[in-house]
Amino acid sequence: MNKLILLIVLFFSTFVFALSEDAEQPIEIEAESVMVDDASGYNEFIGDAEVRQGSLVMTAEIIQVQTNADGVETMVAKGTLEQPAKYIQSQENQARFIEATAVLITYDVNEGMIFLVGDAYLVQGFDSFSGDTLTYDINNDKVLVKSSEDGTKRVKFTIDL
């Protein structure tokens, strides 16, 4: 049993990080319309919105970007069950992308955290996670998935060896 636990810990201790160069790239945003409030740093992009920064791509019907004097704090992508928000980014030392979908995706740039709410799904390398909510710590390569409170949406983890 201890050997199995050690094997699992070793398997999951392989660190996979998003590309560090992405943070140094300019952010490009496209949408059908935009609302900008310079005083508060709140920006809302509506209608087939897309954010690009290096290999990072977020798409949704609505994307909200909160900025401060240092730059972007958070990006929130709002989709629906029928057309979820999407997040894609290259990973260091990996041929595959991090891919995520959910009704609501919040990317906390400063903390390096991605929060998925509502039919959350994440593919990292050859592994996939799904549940009602999902938290992905980019900097520490940790995933926390939770089932729905009513128990209708259980957590699922798939390892593709």
Language-model segments: residues:
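Mature-chain termini and adjacent capping regions
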Residues: M1-I8, S13-L161
